Amino acid sequence: MKLLQKKGYKVERPLNKGSYGTVVLAHRLFRTPRCKDLKYAIKCIKKPAYTFLQEVNILRQLSRSRHRNIIHFVESFEDNVYYYVVLEYCPLGDLYECILNNDFPNAKNQPEMIKNIFLQIIDGVAHLHSHGIYHRDLKPENFLLSLSEDGSELVVKISDFGLACRDKISYDFGTGSDRYMAPEQFEEVDGAGYSPRAADIWALGICLLNLIFARNPFTYPHEKDPIFADYMLDAMTLFDVFPTLSQDTYNVLRACLCVSPEKRSLAKTREAVLAVTKWTTDDEELESFVNEEEEFRASDFMPAEDNVRCTQSDREPLRTPSVLTPANTIQRGLLPSKLPALSDVDENISTSSSPRSPASLAPVNNSERSYDSGLGESLNNMHIGKSIATAVPVNTKRSPYSCSAPAIVFPNSIKGNKDHLKFGRSWCDMDEEDEEDIVSFGSNDDFGASDELSSKHIGLADDWNVLSQWNDNS
């Protein structure tokens, strides 16, 4: 770690830690033509790290065509123990924490803010794809946030290229984060590979649902997930999972969450986002409620024979949900903005009260290569076979308004459990004992006896901070 000082960096504090390294905040002791900013985030990756060179090569390639929605690479160097990657520092953290706390900078108009954030992510992904680079681990934790130079605009930057590749067809199954994986990426079928480009587009659809509802629609993209099995049969079951989903939002999802990879389109996704006027029907439901209240009040002055309310005979029946959760569950997301932060729990799919093995749903992997993203261990790196529990049959005769998708478990405290991420820990997951271990790193100028650090102190560098196919004619 003393090499950092020799290179002109003074460590201020740790930002993240994981199983193979740390991310620290450092400032420049002096400026150079390459390092014009004062603060940087430095990934310190313990050797050996087999994907390091590929990640750095991709970052270098992207730095030559700098894009505002891609994290900027500054430089890299190494000593006998660590690789060091110097990247721009994003002081606002990541998108996951903003969703978790329902706290976005400059969020005066939340519907427009969602559109702005998602369009920036699409533009960043389009830039990657235009250069033949495919991320394969797109999720809110890997979208860092900063402000424009004048401080008036929130800027989203795609980060963590530990699983990125240039292969148009990939055979690396089970890489990334299972809740965001495309079905063909999650599990090998008949020895066929998958398109990382199409897998990235699928992940964008899951990210959008997170952004709007703070929820994931599926626990994993496999037919043994009952909600995903229903979705494969009929994409409109999303309206059962998210009752306030607007038609505009559904049109966006039609372009990116197609079960058939060849039908996914980044250009059509962007076009549909631009056409969105509202992401949810919350306003419509509120207006309907107010109108019904007025009707009830007016009925007090009607003759008795007129004071009767009947249902319409041609009214369409309510959909029957596949997975049921408590009827009083509230879908907490960005819309509406003033709902209290509530935790939601998966039922019939996972057990939230007891920790799960991070790889309990891992697909079988024939490769012995290590796939480890900057946010944590991927399924391939666990070397544990696939074990997916068969879903328990459930009673389906309930109103769809009492149903709920498998949820991201958002704890009330930042220190809460994030076992659902399943790929290592964020800095905010550390307990007090972990913090005591790492605080000493930046306690003095030489980064605290760094030459004697053991693997106890250094962990995985989190990213800082079929059946019927989709009917496009529907």
Swiss-Prot record:
This is Serine/threonine-protein kinase ksp1. One of its GO terms (cellular component) is cytosol. InterPro entries: Kinase-like_dom_sf, Prot_kinase_dom, Ser/Thr_kinase_AS. SMART domains: S_TKc. Its main location: cytoplasm. Its EC number is 2.7.11.1. Residues 345-373 are annotated as: Disordered. GO terms for biological process: G2/M transition of mitotic cell cycle; TOR signaling. Disulfide bonds: none annotated. Belongs to the protein kinase superfamily. Ser/Thr protein kinase family. Residues 9-280 form the Protein kinase domain. The modification Phosphoserine is found at S353, S354, S357, S378, S404, S413. SUPFAM superfamilies: Protein kinase-like (PK-like). It catalyses: L-seryl-[protein] + ATP = O-phospho-L-seryl-[protein] + ADP + H(+); L-threonyl-[protein] + ATP = O-phospho-L-threonyl-[protein] + ADP + H(+).
